[in-house]
Amino acid sequence: MAGAASALFLLDIKGRVLVWRDYRGDVSAAQAERFFTKLIEKEGDSQSNDPVAYDNGVTYMFVQHSNVYLMIASRQNCNAASLLFFLHRVVDVFKHYFEELEEESLRDNFVVVYELLDEMMDFGYPQYTEARILSEFIKTDAYRMEVTQRPPMAVTNAVSWRSEGIQYKKNEVFLDVIENVNILVNSNGQIVRSDVVGALKMRTYLTGMPECKLGLNDRVLLEAQGRATKGKAIDLEDIKFHQCVRLARFENDRTISFIPPDGAFDLMTYRLSTQVKPLIWVEAQIESHSRSRVEMLIKARSQFKERSTATNVEIELPVPTDASNPTVRTSLGSASYAPEKDALVWKIKSFPGNKEYMLRAEFHLPSITAEEATPERKAPIRVKFEIPYFTVSGIQVRYLKIIEKSGYQALPWVRYITMAGEYELRLV
């Protein structure tokens, strides 16, 4: 068994202890001061982002959230990655209970914090980290805590993420395949970074203990099995499944089989790092006239098939900080000047595929401008959009089956959405 945590500390931004829980008796509260000293020493180091530090026989693993440090100290040869993952789950649980994890919420709810730390870790080993399950027997009401005498079924059940006895009048499953496109284009029009981060997000409202089976399109399945495919295979990376997925079954026949938690959760996340063609391309031509007037010609072109349509398109165009009196014309949509952003915001509700639209704008500048004025740093063009019924990767859900011993019929709903993530073009 991997080494255990000796203690867990919650520290403020200055390194002062807010709460700490000793699990094994082999460290003291002084460990917090030694950790923070190491943290300060690391600030000037090129590896300062390393979440693990070692000092005098003690390993420190930490994460920072808002103005709080969560730190585990251990004297054993522990699995640092596992304990760091546990700290992130602690953050999720605290946010579930207190909405915001920050110094004030910990001080106001320190009794609940101690109770949660006792349930989430036992003798230094992680235990229950599902917020829904913990909330069944650790309840808060105006900073009061109630502890039920009998633990919920989910704690003693093999399926710890789902309680027994769940009932719904209408049994439904909603599955959203959401992909975020990240693109960075430099001033020469070259793509310097592109990837797609995807997630299969589920919301389940099902009675009992249902068994779900999900099948993806052949290009994903066959690629995973190393067999030949028709057309281009989908090369997904960094695939992560929710703990409910039977990994042994997936390794055997690539079937995603699981008993789902109740409510919303991420069934699977993945990344696609192959070169992605920009779905919306923006070109900008800027002309300055005797330093008193600037004209902009912007062309926005959709580079996806005509059968798809982008919605809620928003193109943020940087303008000089001292610009004023804008005059704007667009061939589609509307544009408004946002002086607080030093930008012109072009909004298009519906942008069909394989189309191009233009925006012309004219701004006035102060009539007197210093000849030696330092050129200001150019902000990038930022683009936001959503494309329903479309995925960049081509991933598709072939089937979603719900089987429950009572034999009820459940309605599965599947939709696809591609969205802009960090989508920037440094063309201006």
Curated annotation (Swiss-Prot):
Q: Which GO terms describe its cellular component?
A: AP-1 adaptor complex; early endosome membrane; nucleus; trans-Golgi network; trans-Golgi network transport vesicle membrane
Q: Which residues form a coiled coil?
A: none
Kindly list the places in or outside the cell where this protein is found, as annotated in its UniProt entry: Golgi apparatus, trans-Golgi network membrane; Early endosome membrane; Cytoplasmic vesicle, Clathrin-coated vesicle membrane
Against InterPro entries, the record matches this protein to:
Adaptor_comp_med_subunit, AP2_Mu_C_sf, AP_mu_sigma_su, Clathrin_mu, Clathrin_mu_CS, Longin-like_dom_sf, MHD
* Null allele phenotype: Short pollen tube growth and failure to exit the style. Compromised cytokinesis due to the mislocalization of the KNOLLE syntaxin. Full spectrum of growth defects, suggestive of compromised auxin signaling and of defective RLK signaling. Cell morphogenesis was also disturbed. Impaired pollen function and growth retardation phenotype.
**Pfam families from the entry?**
Adap_comp_sub, Clat_adaptor_s
Q: Which SUPFAM superfamilies match?
A: Second domain of Mu2 adaptin subunit (ap50) of ap2 adaptor, SNARE-like
Q: Please list the residue ranges annotated as the MHD domain.
A: 170-426
**A GO biological process held by the record:** intracellular protein transport
Keywords assigned by UniProt, alphabetized: Cytoplasmic vesicle, Endosome, Golgi apparatus, Membrane, Protein transport, Transport
- Mode of membrane association: Peripheral membrane protein
Q: What is its main location?
A: Golgi
Q: Name the tissues where it is expressed.
A: Ubiquitous.
Q: How does it assemble?
A: Adaptor protein complex 1 (AP-1) is a heterotetramer composed of two large adaptins (gamma-type subunit and beta-type subunit), a medium adaptin (mu-type subunit) and a small adaptin (sigma-type subunit).
The record's comment on protein family reads: Belongs to the adaptor complexes medium subunit family.
Q: What does this protein do?
A: Subunit of clathrin-associated adaptor protein complex 1 that plays a role in protein sorting at the trans-Golgi network and early endosomes (TGN/EE). The AP complexes mediate the recruitment of clathrin to membranes and the recognition of sorting signals within the cytosolic tails of transmembrane cargo molecules. Required for KNOLLE localization at the cell plate to mediate cytokinesis. Functions redundantly with AP1M1 in multiple post-Golgi trafficking pathways leading from the TGN to the vacuole, the plasma membrane, and the cell-division plane.
Q: What is this protein called?
A: AP-1 complex subunit mu-2
Q: What's the source species for this entry?
A: Arabidopsis thaliana (Mouse-ear cress)
At the highest ranks, the source species' classification is:
Eukaryota, Viridiplantae, Streptophyta, Embryophyta, Tracheophyta
Which gene carries the instructions for this protein?
AP1M2
